[in-house]
Amino acid sequence: MARYIGPKCKLSRREGTDLFLKSGARALDSKCKAENVPGQHGQRRGRLSDYGLQLREKQKVRRIYGVLERQFRGYYQEASRRKGSTGENLLQLLECRLDNVVYRMGFGSTRAESRQLVSHKAITVNGQTVNIPSYQVKAGDVVAIREKSRNQLRIAQALELCGQRGRVEWVEVDLDKKTGTFKSVPARSDLSADINENLIVELYSK
């Protein structure tokens, strides 16, 4: 499956906000001007149409969670079939991805690194190795680093970074055992206010 491997800063500049694609100290900073779009001359972004706003919001969320278009549309379709708010359902499906849960627990410094840990079979769910980043974690599931992978330096560094930025309330982590419990699916109020999921619903509803 194709994935973007270019400069992460360029994606954050395109969306005009930090997408948290880099680990802690290397996140979007003064050297990466978010008010300017990528390009040789770094032009300031102009006013967007309603469609443009909807498209940019969809791209922003897609890039935050590292999901390609076809899979993202599949999440939207699943969200629309569920009871309740389609936008909230969409964000919850993305939050329940195993690679995202690994990131939220602090085992990976970024979602991309967390996805790699999953793909390389360094993660277990309820004692069973799972190497599918899109695996949907359920409330009560126990996610852990496999014993032979627990001494990796990058995991120790990621846990330190997570301690600095703060861990979310819907996961509980045992730092000594390098295990975590996904306590519950987060409510919309628990998630970033910087995301306007209604714009995404409007885009796909056309």
Swiss-Prot record:
Q: List the protein's name.
A: Small ribosomal subunit protein uS4
The task this protein performs is described as:
One of the primary rRNA binding proteins, it binds directly to 16S rRNA where it nucleates assembly of the body of the 30S subunit.
User: Does the record carry Acetylation as a key word?
Assistant: no
Please state which protein family the record places this protein in.
Answer: Belongs to the universal ribosomal protein uS4 family.
Q: Which gene encodes it?
A: rpsD
**PROSITE patterns according to UniProt:** RIBOSOMAL_S4, S4
Kindly list the biological process annotations in GO that this record carries.
ribosomal small subunit biogenesis; translation
Is-annotated flag, keyword Nucleus? no
Native source species:
Pseudomonas paraeruginosa (strain DSM 24068 / PA7) (Pseudomonas aeruginosa (strain PA7))
Domain of life according to the entry: Bacteria
- Provide the S4 RNA-binding domain boundaries: 96-156
**InterPro entries from the UniProt entry:** Ribosomal_uS4, Ribosomal_uS4_bac-type, Ribosomal_uS4_CS, Ribosomal_uS4_N, S4_RNA-bd, S4_RNA-bd_sf
Record's Gene3D superfamilies?
Ribosomal Protein S4 Delta 41, Chain A, domain 1, RNA-binding S4 domain
A GO CC annotation recorded here is: small ribosomal subunit
Q: Which UniProt keywords apply?
A: Ribonucleoprotein, Ribosomal protein, RNA-binding, rRNA-binding
The molecular function terms of the Gene Ontology recorded here are: rRNA binding; structural constituent of ribosome
Subunit organization: Part of the 30S ribosomal subunit. Contacts protein S5. The interaction surface between S4 and S5 is involved in control of translational fidelity.
